[in-house]
């Protein structure tokens, strides 16, 4: 029953303004879902019955028709449980945070690559201080090859390879992952031999 509670004087239901704000939040969430790539969308806990509506909204490009289809998508989304929509929002927030960390890591890898090419062994020593698991000889060879390629105006194969090596080196730390299983096993073996 709508209206006020006779004893407490509080409203029984949400106000129209609150309902409108909730509907606009769902519409904004729908816009985010439509803007995602299929791979990003597959990682989210989106109910199966919403996927065709999202695909249809992506397909329509005419402004007014797109807006109307987006409103239709939001209407279907409002029928979902609040917990489902909250799970989608949480997953979107986690994806955006992971994406920001990956971009920051890539910038760091590019900076290290430029520093390695400019400073040589001095920068390599600093890199090994930060990342002791790095292969010194491999990086030194790649830096030397990249400098030679640049001097001879050859395609920058080693230059790209330095970035790939740095990326694989920095990615676990950027994403907050533990060391690789091989490193953990090596540490466990070393600990077991210390105990004997």
From Swiss-Prot:
> What InterPro entries does the record tag this protein with?
DarP (IPR006839), DarP_sf (IPR023153)
Cellular component terms per the entry's GO annotation: cytosol
The subcellular localization recorded is: Cytoplasm
Tell whether Metal-binding is among the UniProt keywords.
no
Its main subcellular localisation, reduced to a broad class, is cytoplasm
Segments spanning the bilayer are: none
The cross-references to Pfam families, in alphabetical order and at most eight, read: DarP
Q: Among its keywords, does the record have Oxidoreductase?
A: no
The record's Gene Ontology biological-process terms are: assembly of large subunit precursor of preribosome
SUPFAM superfamilies reported for this sequence? PSPTO4464-like
Keywords, A to Z, come to: Cytoplasm, Ribosome biogenesis, RNA-binding, rRNA-binding
GO terms of molecular function: ribosome binding; rRNA binding
User: What is the role of this chain?
Assistant: Member of a network of 50S ribosomal subunit biogenesis factors which assembles along the 30S-50S interface, preventing incorrect 23S rRNA structures from forming. Promotes peptidyl transferase center (PTC) maturation.
NCBIfam families linked to this entry = PRK05255.1-1
State the family it belongs to.
Belongs to the DarP family.
Can you say what this protein is called?
Dual-action ribosomal maturation protein DarP
Q: Which organism is it from?
A: Stenotrophomonas maltophilia (strain R551-3)
């Amino acid at each position: 029953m709508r209206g006020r509670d006779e004893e407490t004087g509080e409203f029984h239901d949400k106000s129209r303004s609150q309902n409108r704000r909730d509907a606009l939040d769902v519409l904004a969430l729908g816009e985010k879902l439509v803007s995602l790539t299929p791979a990003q969308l597959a990682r989210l806990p989106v109910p199966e019955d919403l996927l065709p509506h999202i695909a249809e909204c992506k397909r329509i490009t005419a402004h007014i028709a797109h807006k109307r289809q987006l409103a239709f998508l939001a209407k279907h989304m409002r029928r979902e449980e609040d917990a489902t929509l909250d799970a989608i929002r949480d997953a979107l927030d986690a994806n955006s945070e992971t994406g920001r960390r990956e971009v920051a890591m890539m910038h760091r890898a590019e900076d290290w690559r430029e520093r390695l090419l400019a400073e040589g062994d001095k920068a390599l020593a600093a890199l090994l201080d930060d990342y002791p698991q790095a292969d010194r000889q491999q990086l030194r060879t790649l830096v030397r090859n990249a400098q030679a390629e640049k001097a001879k105006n050859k395609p920058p194969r080693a230059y790209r390879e330095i970035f790939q090596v740095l990326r694989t080196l920095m990615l676990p730390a950027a994403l907050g992952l533990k060391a690789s299983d091989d490193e953990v096993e090596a540490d466990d073996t070393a600990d077991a031999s210390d105990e004997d």
